[in-house]
Amino acid sequence: MNRRKALAFALAGFALATLAAAAAPPEPPGYRLDDYQSPTPDTFNGEPALSVEAAKAAWSDPKTIFIDVLPHPPRPEGLPKGTIWQEKPHAGIARSIWLPEVGRGALAPETEAYFSRSLSEITGGDKDAILVFYCKRACWMSWNAAKRAASMGYSQVRWYSDGIEGWREAGLPTETIAPRP
């Protein structure tokens, strides 16, 4: 009887692993244009997404640049004149730079120019700087932003797919960050 249970558990584990592997979609040829909070590929440019351990190792090198691409919530419309509105603090991976909105599938020309200019400024024009893009777990915006940076000629682009949630769960340092102007 114990053999049967062991075999059943082994088969169940194999089935779950197979289903989990099948759940990850392949890398698309272009950008994801909608449904950003959905299953993401396990890879970026054919390379595995950074694990928490790999992201932590990359972060330990102060030359590595972590970039948060989570959108910035706008000021609510229709607030009466003179209303004081205070933004909710945004926690990011410590030492990261927040470039909101740059992970959408289609960017307005102004947003694309902002992204290009920001990358040039934060890397000092070094197209070989190591860039790690993140957002939330299973968020296509960070994948899109990484793809866009690579298309701009940046050669050391990495994608951290577990995002801020994975970082926090690992007990790694975070800090309140503001959007880069």
Segments predicted by a language model, with ranges:
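Glycine-rich nucleotide phosphate-binding loop and flanking beta-alpha elements
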Residues: 73
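Short hydrophobic beta-strand that contains or immediately precedes a catalytic carboxylate
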Residues: 55, 65-70
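Rhodanese-like catalytic fold shared by cysteine-dependent sulfurtransferases
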Residues: 2, 9, 19-53, 58-61, ...
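Sec-dependent N-terminal signal peptides
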Residues: 7-14
